[in-house]
Amino acid sequence: GLFDIIKKIAESF
C-alpha cells in the first residue's frame, strides 16, 4: 500500500 512506499523511501535516507 501507500505506507509501504513511504517505508521504502524512508529506508533510503
From Swiss-Prot:
Keyword set, alphabetical order: Amidation, Amphibian defense peptide, Antibiotic, Antimicrobial, Secreted
Entry comment describing in which tissues the protein is expressed: Expressed by the skin dorsal glands.
Major localization class: secreted
Compartments it resides in: Secreted
Top-level taxon of the source organism: Eukaryota
InterPro entries to which the protein is assigned, alphabetical: Aurein_antimicrobial_peptide
Any GO CC annotation of this UniProt entry: extracellular region
GO biological process: defense response to bacterium
Modified residues (Phenylalanine amide): F13
The protein's role, per its UniProt record: Antimicrobial activity against B.cereus, L.lactis, L.innocua, M.luteus, P.multocida, S.aureus, S.epidermidis and S.uberis. Probably acts by disturbing membrane functions with its amphipathic structure. Shows anticancer activity.
Family: Belongs to the frog skin active peptide (FSAP) family. Aurein subfamily.
Name of this chain's protein: Aurein-1.2
Source organism of this protein record: Ranoidea raniformis (Southern bell frog)
